[in-house]
Amino acid sequence: MSKEERPGREEILECQVMWEPDSKKNTQMDRFRAAVGAACGLALESYDDLYHWSVESYSDFWAEFWKFSGIVFSRVYDEVVDTSKGIADVPEWFKGSRLNYAENLLRHKENDRVALYIAREGKEEIVKVTFEELRQEVALFAAAMRKMGVKKGDRVVGYLPNSEHAVEAMLAAASIGAIWSSTSPDFGVNGVLDRFSQIQPKLIFSVEAVVYNGKEHNHMEKLQQVVKGLPDLKKVVVIPYVSSRENIDLSKIPNSVFLDDFLATGTSEQAPQLEFEQLPFSHPLFIMFSSGTTGAPKCMVHSAGGTLIQHLKEHLLHGNMTSSDILLCYTTVGWMMWNWMVSLLATGAAMVLYDGSPLVPTPNVLWDLVDRIGITVLVTGAKWLSVLEEKAMKPVETHSLQMLHTILSTGSPLKAQSYEYVYRCIKSSILLGSISGGTDIISCFMGHNFSLPVYKGEIQARNLGMAVEAWNEEGKAVWGESGELVCTKPIPCQPTHFWNDENGNKYRKAYFSKFPGIWAHGDYCRINPKTGGIVMLGRSDGTLNPNGVRFGSSEIYNIVESFEEVEDSLCVPQYNKYREERVILFLKMASGHAFQPDLVKRIRDAIRMGLSARHVPSLILETKGIPYTLNGKKVEVAVKQIIAGKAVEQGGAFSNPETLDLYRDIPELQGF
């Protein structure tokens, strides 16, 4: 098996091993590696061998995984993929096959096994939904949708919390061949309309109110304005979520109906039966949206087959998930992690739908659920782990966490110190996996792996079938050095197209304008040639390059945020008219600490010692707020545009849009 040539820095720091795989445990990855070796006559001794085969012979890899995964289909494929086409050609996958995404998620016949656990802030009760009950509910939703005229290709949307209703509505839409899209109640009216108005939905599901952070938030006024901005809607289904229907007034929302009445329209004397439209592998399943922090969100169309087979690969092989697992992913329906989570049902595992704050009534709320339910896998944001560390929480002392074997972190790079915190203060025997990908591929390029050690500060490995490299500006792969994250070969989970992008120009500009024919993901990373692990260095559109030294903002954050005086930070470039660049670091001070010259000096010294003199920011300034997206990601690009004097279209994508004004007309930034 040929391997990449890896010229470059071999003097990578020896990484600290935090976890090692159990050599006695026969994982699904091990079984797949053995099956491939037997079927293809290959000696695949390690994950590294399997990975390199999977990207060099990617057509064979996906064919073998199709068999291994047990995908349910009504017609087998004629061809896996045309290997003469590159990733920029967006080749069709598994041509000729017919299947249904929802059928694959609802195929498990142990009817009394729990599929969903529903937990909500402020409610003690945990509601259980079995696979049989889920099938019955999806059948009701689908029958009512068909009755009102929803058909293949129509758009059905949810403006919903993370609840069973969102899962049921999505699976019903998928069973028909309609296209699902969703946003969460924390989106404002503009943010919702920026997204949904582009795709002209026929049907919307929503709720009358939600509870978050100890408060009830009425949703009806926002819903009313959203409906007004969506002229193609034929029906608005309102789900009583906090109040009973007697206390909800629908009179101001045209074509509105309560959920019970909507479901009743599809029933007759006999309960409706589930029907699954048999559709091409490439049939659209989801429309996902980019963050919209610098303009109108892009509408990415993801196929049913591509999403299914990619998610199965991640859950079965990389996550070693089985039907005995229970996963809690702290997410909203407006984030791709929700879609990723729901696909877990295809493995027969159960998932916990939690709606509410992860810090109310106490920061232990998720750990309480882990113990009460017996959760085996917890998926959360890197930021939440940092918050727990700041609050000195020690679940290892307060909770048993007996069944928990995996914690996955996503949303932003996981800091090296967070690895130490998790293994010291949460559980020493778990696999801590940092996973990274994006909405663009509705999945991961790299992530967790039960076949490999966990090294402090590194994502374990590139995922099977994902031909990922770090490239320099000249388009050459670099090892042990910072580079642009690229994918060089076709993958079934890339968008089939963008909605309303007939000539494909937006699609090409988004991924293929930097390196022709090669997917540039917009992230900056470094691949360790010794361990194969990856360090994410931030968005490449936020890459810093003062005096010809390229580095990612997270390299600065990792140092700065170890200072107890600093609550948060933001690092962006500023350019003058000659396109010369300097680095500006903004600090948000922790409560009880003042911005002082001594702190600035200590931070400069720490960056100089930890990185180099050329990494030291030109200016370090105080700010009262750091802008974040609704999904908890720092917004560097919009701030970069503001300090350059450019207008920023907010796109309703910010959790705290008022903070953007803090970066306008800063005196210290004038005259550069």
From Swiss-Prot:
Catalytic class of the enzyme: ligase
Any GO BP: positive regulation of insulin secretion
UniProt-recorded name of the protein: Acetoacetyl-CoA synthetase
Organism name: Homo sapiens
GO CC term, one of those recorded: cytosol
Underlying gene: AACS
Location of the protein in the cell: Cytoplasm, Cytosol
Substrates-to-products reaction catalysed: acetoacetate + ATP + CoA = acetoacetyl-CoA + AMP + diphosphate
An example molecular function term from Gene Ontology annotations: acetoacetate-CoA ligase activity
